[in-house]
Amino acid sequence: MRVLWFTNTPSNYKASSKGYNGGGWISSLEKEFIQIENIELAISFELSGEPFKVENEGVTYYPISYAKKKKIGKLFELLSNSVCNYSVEIEEYLKIIDDFKPDIIEVFGSERSFGLVAPFTSIPVVLHIQGILNPYYNAYLPPFISWKQLSSVNPLKLIQQYKNKKRWMNSCKRETEILKRIKYYIGRTSWDERVTRIFNPTCQYFYGSEILREPFYLLSERILPSDLRIVTTISSPLYKGFDLILKTAKILKETLHLNFTWEVFGNINPQFIEKNTGITYESVNIKLCGVAQAEEIKQKILNCTCFFHPSYIDNSPNSVCEAQILGCTVISTNVGGIPSLITDNVNGFLIPSNDPYQAAYLICQLYKDTVLNENIGNNAKMVAVQRHDKQKIVSSLIGNYQQIIDSSHRNK
């Protein structure tokens, strides 16, 4: 079986030169996938200044380098209210398909233009759902923030804010076209299946879990600390919920009078949220740790009271799954696909988005009741070990591919 992936990252291409957490879960999948007999894998991704094709350790890589768009073209994209012309990109994708001649094509994510190639090839195309831009855009701003407020932070950045918003809107329109064009989907949650069927009611949907980063599979022991420690891994977009962390931490400190440490990993720009909440992260025992390697995050999770996930929207965040497989109790907002990962009060806790009061109560409860904490964490680990079993995931993926290929042949 010849398989072509279009991905948002280079996966293991030049893996030794990467500095930022490797290639993530797709690189983990690649390592397992290429060990299967009778599988030939090619991976294509955007990366300028590279050859058209590179073969390395049994994988064929196709870095894509687009010709630079003229300024007038960029201006048209910025001002346009319709899906832009992606003929140049589609032509590049078709060259790769023609060169590799795959039996099946998997597009990882609907965030970029890869999926637009589906109507132009007879090869079956399946979309691996990651996030879905349209509902993400709907939840982009916390309830106390407007686009006007966001633009007024720095008048000098007004044009940049407009461009960012316009890019999101255009990407959502492009995604809508992709979801209409692709017939086959692989997802993991009730949420991503429901949303996909809104855009494409007749699509064929297959379940497929994701492989986590390697350090989280290694045998590890969770040790509850005597002091209260909370860990979170998020990124900078406002919908990731840093405001909920600030508000929850304030209740823990000023109302419940608890001593604690809250370590937040990832690229965080706190100034805007601090200004709008009136809470500075230093004043409520929060430590911004920046980007860290998987092993460091793993050790922090193994030695914390709980893992807190504050997003206003998410599908199946790997940060939550990584905490679960380590046996850590997760408190998360009840949004998007997260209820497919966590059963409330069984293998974790779910709270409404923007509810710092329940969040603070549950953190306090887990700190005081170590038996409850350990039981919930153990339940989470049992579920996550099954969900993220490497062999099962790869076997399921190949089975999905074969079903899609067979279905495609029947429909010709």
How would you name each of these model-derived features?
Residues 1-55, 59, 250:
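N-terminal subdomain of nucleotide-sugar transferases
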Residues 4, 221-240, 246-249:
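Conserved donor-binding/catalytic core segment of Leloir-type glycosyltransferases
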Residues 28-29, 133, 149-185, 198:
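Membrane-proximal helix-turn-helix segments that form the acceptor-binding/catalytic region
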Residues 273-295:
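Nucleotide-activated donor-binding/catalytic signature segment of Leloir-type glycosyltransferases, i.e.
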Residues 312:
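Aromatic "clamp/platform" in nucleotide-sugar-dependent glycosyltransferases that forms part
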Residues 329-332:
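Short hydrophobic beta-strand element within catalytic cores of glycosyltransferases
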Residues 344-345, 349-356, 365-370:
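Conserved acidic donor-binding segment of nucleotide-sugar-dependent glycosyltransferases
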